[in-house]
Amino acid sequence: MGQVIGFFQSLPEIINEALNIALICVALLATIKGMVNIWKSGLIQLLFFLTLAGRSCSHSFTIGRFHEFQSVTVNFTQFMSYAPSSCSVNNTHHYFKGPQNTTWGLELTLTNESMINITNSMRVFTNIHHNVTNCVQNISEHEGVLKWLLETMHLSISKPGKHIAPVMCERQKGLLIEYNLTMTKDHHPNYWNQVLYGLAKLLGSSKRLWFGACNKADCQMQSDHQHIKCNYSNCKGYTSFKYLIIQNTTWENHCEYNHLNTIHLLMSPIGQSFITRRLQAFLTWTLSDALGNDLPGGYCLEQWAVVWFGIKCFDNTAMAKCNQNHDSEFCDMLRLFDYNRNAIQSLNDQSQARLNLLTNTINSLVSDNLLMKNKLRELMNVPYCNYTRFWFINDTKNGRHTLPQCWLVSDGSYLNETRFRTQWLSESNSLYTEMLTEEYEKRQGRTPLSLVDLCFWSTLFYISTLFAHLVGFPTHRHLIGEGCPKPHRLTGSGICSCGHYGIPGKPVRWTKMSR
């Protein structure tokens, strides 16, 4: 009795403590729920948007829960340092810088005024791109670049059956070569078409003035429903300028060079001379892991080769796709990197046959079709790949990557991510599919086949018995109007063999077992 009285006396204190706990719980729940409501209302997102509006966008954003859109930019400064590079200031002034850290270059100018006095000049014919010393003096440094430039303009004009019209040059002014672009009866029109096409190949898409009348056919609307792509054929060269002048100049950072033209140099026949002389400088890329160890399980671009990314690694799954099809610009770059190890070892044997083998191998590593396709896309003012920036989808949870795709360029700038949104969403879905497929195959490999069969048949048995359970079968007979006769078992006549139910003829019915 005393314990009961003591309990009732302490009840107010217990109630006060319980009430305090309840108040704390209610306050916490209300605060948390209020924060969730603010987040779902979009107020915080609006403040973030207003704060960041107008600022530069990051090229790394989330797609779904674990996938991120990222990019890597390759630094070609060291990769192409030994080869000539080109750039354009405007439609009339174009520059070609010499290899390495040279201070000289070649200036290509389109003008309507001649710089050479015809009476004091000598005429040089088809052998100008073989022996330029007949035209100018003291150009040992410029000779390689000049040969490449002329070879590209003439489109391998030295082949049998090809002829070029004469050009003008003047020794007294150093390196000075002048082309007369005026169409005359003396100048074969096919030759000028080839020269103008070579200029378009060198100078890029912004110089579409090189092409006049074209037969346009097979026009189709693109997937973005904003552009129409047409196949052009039988284009005739055309330009409003009368003269093309090539002369030497000092290099003062005239403009930003385009290394896509330099890659064309490496792929061209005249470029083999550069590769032969500078092979060791050309193959200076390395493969390593994040700690600098040689050749890891996957591919890593070292810090000097990547802009703003430090060391960037890609897993073996993404790289294995490069062995399936030769249709990726990123894979072409990796083939050059991977070739580095054996090439440097082979350079210990300096025989001419070995060098020829190496140069031919380099030429086969990069896809000619891809390179030409991107150059043609540039000429037609269609977004093209310049082999510099590549985008990919990164799974932040598992560290998996998609095969990097080239970030296309249009009008001198990279496309906005929204222009190829369908592509990176498709890549994200493909990465999910690959991961699920690999996980399924991995689980299949760890599971015995007999266990799978047992699981299948047991599941089938369970489903069958489930229907039987729902339907139910009658288990015994009842006398209509009377109680359960169990444990006696009645016959169809309503009697039991033990004699307890001995009067036959009573009506019976089947009854299910009680559950």
Curated annotation (Swiss-Prot):
Parts of the chain that traverse the membrane: 18-33, 454-474
Binding site for Zn(2+) 2: H476, H478, C484
Extracellular side: 2-17, 59-453
Topological domain spans for side Cytoplasmic: 34-58, 475-515
Keyword Zinc: yes
Family of the protein in this entry: Belongs to the arenaviridae GPC protein family.
Name used for this protein in its record: Pre-glycoprotein polyprotein GP complex
Species per Swiss-Prot/TrEMBL record: Latino mammarenavirus (isolate Rat/Bolivia/MARU 1924/1965) (LATV)
Gene: GPC
